[in-house]
């Protein structure tokens, strides 16, 4: 080992941070002075291969800043260099020339002030996760962590910490799964992070850590299994001393080993070598694998290098500096340690293989990372899950009813916790800010008449076993006057849905016209201070009031159709206005609170808290179909029990199409539509088809955007079934695809989507299930065809029918294929459908295309030839 102690040629400055990036070591001084040295040149100087007088920095420049401040943070990669003080953060892109591996001049670098905070808020740490491409900025006083996207520097999200604690330093996970924060209240917070900035607190460790308002440098092991905790004071009497604990992430963060030395008291810098070492024992024919850790205290200038297998210092540079060590960093190969002291002296510890051991290849480290415990996939926030382009004929409103509603079937006891819903995204100074409105729900009523409570069967002398102990007589409850009033329509209802809580103020803007804003300011719910409802139009940043009304009630939900606006009150009254503010009809009084209120086109859909479903045609001012209920959707037979109250599935979506078809999805993934002709609910999307159907698209989720669908008319000569299936899957206007997307979301949320292939392989090997896949596939296609008829989608119906007939032909289902051909050949129009299906030539033209597509399938030519002759396709 060789040590190079090199005092930097800077006057009256300190160097607080360094970083090993590529072949360079970057230093940042207190006056905004940045220097870059070649690592190999420093190592060669340590081994006397280069004269020390020839040693000089590769480049040196001054950080562009209005007021000079100390630089404490430096991080980045080979593309962008991030340099930060306690109030500002700069980015230097293009600092390294990829072709020559040389540092560009300052003139060729693109510098930009990325972030700035004002006193009393300060930046306590800046970390960059190269795997996720996320930059973490820790802020004190505001007590939060900002997450920015690398390169674009868009704000992804922020992590808010309790007001009583401040984030001191962060620790990056080499695998990009977690981000650990050490706070001023001696707690350690472990967050799960993904590339979109979604985060979740997965652990709050009890391993207390004593942190001071200093700038700490801490890193994890390269295999990402050990989390170091410096200055741990858990279980130490009177806090007389502290130690450095190594926690095993795969064993619920339990302490595996401990470093205890005088210099570890008040540890400030702890950096793992990025290499994983192996030392063979030639006598025994074995080898030992271990990590190396470099540590330094906050006051003395001692540097220790630890072997994690022996837990004893492998190397001890006792008081190598008369001042404290500010920062340390290992080279990528793990054989050089760089350190900077408070007196601006650069230390280069150049080791050899005989000193440290053999560094294993990176592939070995990757394999060790794969052994670590895998975290479940993070669920994206609701606002992130809403697709950018909704189906044209279905509109999900940004109102309370778009959030999952807890519901109780027959008898329900509790409601779901309040959910928060993100709404609009705005761009300000290049940073995307998210405005959110909190939507909370009142739990469903669980009051029942006293006489309906089931009582246990009383014991009589005839049914008491001889010798059994006599039961103690229970005390009878005392009845009081002025007990709570029971509402009969709620207390006797078989369904109880949660209702939105009252918000003091909220705004609503329809998706198809964001310039119109309905502003609701709730009053006290009486004549003394009525609610103000105002519709404004934003044109060229000018607000114009279209209409205003005063309602002596509290408003909960609002929505809008093509030519009308509607909102409902807490007591179940619905108000409907035109765009100019004219009331289209008198208030509709339902007498019970409303859980969902949705509009699309000329239709208004309402779902009450007791499960009643109303659908009005506002243009014709009448019910689209008789009042119905959602009770059959909630599996009443499966939910029955002896208790009065039981839980049911949550309603995650309740909406309506432009043609007046109600749609409902549940938290189990099932999707339904209401058939007004049959006056019953139809199953549209079932999670079972995801397990067995070959035409179920598991990648169709709201977190992914499909390519633009081909909306041109279908060409019957196109016989490639794969192209047709791809065209169907990529149709963003398809309601069926949208409901199947919701099913995939629920399967992902419950972690079932990853078991689909395993389930399919297992079940198909069992006796009697060999043809299960083709049967489920045909069942899935048949259901989609029938639903497309009810939704009056002739384009989608034609494509699905083409795929279905080709599939029947390939599988040899001749009788079923003949049945389909006969149905298409008949002159009878498809019942209960619109003008497109009513055309008498519609089915005949479709049959011609199918016959041409199936004509080259030999095993069904006997069927296709007969119909082709009847239709004069062949002679």
Swiss-Prot record:
A single GO cellular-component term on record: cytosol
Residue ranges of WD repeats: 10-47, 118-158, 163-201, 237-277, 278-316, 320-359, 546-587, 589-626
Feature: compositional bias, Polar residues: 424-446
In this chain, the stretch annotated as Disordered covers: 398-473
What are the protein's GO molecular function terms?
transcription corepressor activity
Q: What is its main location?
A: nucleus
Q: Subcellular location, in the record's words?
A: Nucleus; Chromosome
Summarize what gene deletion causes: Abolishes localization of RTT106 to the HTA1-HTB1 promoter.
Q: Give start-end ranges for the coiled-coil region(s).
A: none
- One of the GO BP terms on file: chromatin remodeling
Q: Which UniProt keywords apply?
A: Chromatin regulator, Chromosome, Nucleus, Phosphoprotein, Repeat, Repressor, Transcription, Transcription regulation, WD repeat
Q: Which residues carry this modification: Phosphoserine?
A: 713
Look up keyword Transcription regulation and say if it applies. Answer: yes
| InterPro entries (UniProt xref) | HIR1-like, HIRA-like_C, WD40/YVTN_repeat-like_dom_sf, WD40_repeat_dom_sf
The protein's matches in Pfam families, at most eight in alphabetical order, are given as: Hira
> How is the subunit organization of this protein annotated in UniProt?
Component of the HIR complex, composed of HIR1, HIR2, HIR3 and HPC2. This complex may consist of one copy of HIR1 and HIR3 and two copies of HIR2 and HPC2. The HIR complex interacts with ASF1. Interacts with SNF2. Interacts with SNF5. Interacts with SWI3. Interacts with RTT106.
Miscellaneous information on this protein: Present with 922 molecules/cell in log phase SD medium.
What role is this protein assigned?
Answer: Component of the HIR complex, which cooperates with ASF1 to promote replication-independent chromatin assembly. The HIR complex is also required for the periodic repression of three of the four histone gene loci during the cell cycle as well as for autogenous regulation of the HTA1-HTB1 locus by H2A and H2B. DNA-binding by the HIR complex may repress transcription by inhibiting nucleosome remodeling by the SWI/SNF complex. The HIR complex may also be required for transcriptional silencing of centromeric, telomeric and mating-type loci in the absence of CAF-1.
Question: Which PANTHER family does the record cross-reference, listed alphabetically?
Answer: MEMBER OF THE HIR1 FAMILY OF WD-REPEAT PROTEINS (PTHR13831), PROTEIN HIR2 (PTHR13831:SF1)
The record's family statement is: Belongs to the WD repeat HIR1 family.
Q: What is this protein called?
A: Protein HIR2
Name the gene.
HIR2
């Amino acid at each position: 080992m060789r040590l190079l102690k090199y005092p930097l040629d800077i006057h009256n400055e300190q160097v607080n941070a360094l970083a090993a990036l590529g072949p360079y070591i970057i230093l940042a001084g207190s006056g905004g002075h940045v220097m870059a040295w070649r690592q190999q040149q420093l190592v060669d100087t340590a081994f006397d291969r280069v004269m020390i007088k020839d040693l000089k920095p590769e480049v040196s420049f001054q950080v562009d800043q209005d007021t000079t401040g100390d630089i404490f943070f430096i991080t980045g990669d080979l593309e962008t260099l991030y340099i930060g003080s306690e109030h500002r953060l700069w980015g230097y892109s293009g600092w390294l020339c990829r072709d020559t591996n040389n540092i560009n001049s300052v003139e060729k670098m693109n510098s930009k002030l990325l972030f700035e905070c004002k006193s009393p808020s300060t930046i306590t740490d800046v970390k960059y996760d190269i795997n996720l491409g996320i930059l973490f900025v820790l802020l004190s006083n505001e007590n939060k962590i900002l997450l920015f996207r690398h390169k674009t520097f868009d704000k992804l999200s922020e992590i808010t910490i309790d007001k009583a604690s401040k984030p001191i330093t962060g620790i990056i996970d080499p695998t990009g799964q977690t981000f650990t924060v050490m706070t001023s209240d001696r707690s350690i917070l472990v967050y799960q992070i993904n590339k979109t900035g979604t985060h979740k607190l997965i652990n709050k460790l009890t391993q207390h850590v004593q942190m001071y308002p200093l700038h700490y440098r801490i890193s994890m092991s390269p295999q990402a299994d050990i989390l170091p905790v410096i200055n741990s004071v858990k279980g130490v009497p009177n806090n007389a001393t502290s130690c450095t604990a190594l926690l095993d992430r795969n064993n619920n963060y339990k302490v595996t080993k401990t470093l205890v030395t005088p210099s570890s008291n008040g540890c400030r810098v702890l950096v793992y070598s990025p290499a994983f070492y192996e030392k063979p024992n030639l006598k025994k024919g074995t080898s030992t694998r271990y990590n190396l850790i470099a540590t330094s205290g906050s006051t003395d200038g001692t540097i220790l290098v630890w072997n994690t297998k022996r837990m004893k210092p492998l190397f001890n540079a006792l008081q190598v500096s008369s001042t404290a060590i500010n920062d340390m960093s290992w080279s990528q190969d793990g054989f050089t340690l760089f350190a900077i002291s408070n007196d601006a002296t650069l230390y280069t510890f150049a080791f050899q293989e005989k000193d440290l051991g053999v560094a294993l290849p990176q592939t070995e480290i990757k394999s060790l990372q794969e052994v670590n415990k895998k975290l479940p996939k993070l669920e994206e926030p609701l606002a992130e899950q809403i697709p950018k382009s909704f189906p044209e004929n279905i509109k999900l409103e940004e109102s309370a009813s778009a959030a999952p509603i807890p519901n109780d079937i027959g008898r329900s006891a509790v409601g779901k916790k309040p959910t928060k819903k993100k709404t609009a995204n705005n761009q300000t100074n290049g940073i995307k800010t998210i405005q959110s409105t909190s939507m909370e729900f009142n739990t469903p009523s669980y009051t029942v008449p006293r006489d309906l409570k089931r009582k246990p069967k009383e014991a009589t002398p005839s049914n008491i076993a001889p010798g059994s102990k006599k039961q103690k007589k229970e005390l009878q409850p005392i009845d009081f006057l002025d007990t709570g009033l029971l509402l009969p329509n709620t207390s006797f209802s078989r369904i109880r849905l949660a209702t939105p809580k009252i918000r003091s103020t909220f705004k609503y803007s329809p998706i198809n016209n964001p310039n119109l804003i309905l502003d609701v300011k709730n009053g006290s719910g009486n004549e003394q201070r009525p609610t103000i409802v105002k519709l404004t139009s934003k044109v060229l940043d000018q607000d114009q009031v279209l209409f205003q009304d005063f309602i002596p009630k509290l408003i909960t939900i609002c929505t809008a159709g093509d030519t009308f606006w509607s909102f409902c009150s807490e007591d179940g009254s619905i108000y409907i206005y035109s765009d100019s503010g004219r009331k289209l009809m008198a208030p509709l009084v339902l007498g019970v609170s409303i859980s969902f209120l949705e509009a699309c086109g000329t239709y208004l859909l309402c779902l009450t808290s007791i499960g009643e479903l109303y659908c009005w045609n506002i243009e014709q001012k009448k019910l689209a179909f008789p009042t119905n209920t959602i009770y059959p959707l909630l599996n009443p037979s499966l939910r029955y029990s002896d208790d009065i109250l039981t839980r049911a599935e949550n309603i995650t979506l309740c909406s309506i199409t432009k043609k007046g078809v109600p749609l409902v999805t549940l938290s189990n993934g099932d999707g339904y539509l209401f058939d007004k002709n049959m006056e019953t609910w139809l199953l549209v999307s079932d999670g079972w088809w995801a397990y067995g159907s070959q035409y179920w698209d598991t990648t169709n989720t709201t977190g992914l955007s499909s390519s633009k669908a081909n909306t041109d008319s279908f060409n019957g000569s196109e016989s490639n079934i794969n192209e047709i299936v791809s065209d169907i899957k990529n149709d963003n206007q398809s309601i069926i695809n949208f409901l199947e997307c919701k099913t995939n979301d629920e399967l992902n949320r419950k972690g079932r989507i990853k078991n689909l292939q395993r389930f399919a392989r297992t079940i198909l090997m069992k006796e009697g299930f060999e043809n299960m896949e083709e049967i489920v596939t045909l069942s899935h296609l048949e259901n989609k065809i029938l639903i497309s008829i009810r939704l009056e989608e002739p384009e989608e119906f034609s494509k699905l029918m083409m795929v279905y007939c080709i599939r029947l032909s390939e599988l040899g289902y001749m009788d079923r294929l003949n049945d389909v051909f006969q149905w298409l050949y008949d002159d009878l129009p498809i019942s209960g459908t619109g003008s497109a299906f009513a055309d008498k030539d519609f089915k005949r033209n479709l049959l011609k295309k199918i016959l041409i597509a199936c004509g080259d399938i030999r095993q069904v030519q006997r069927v296709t030839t007969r119909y082709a002759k009847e239709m004069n396709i062949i002679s």
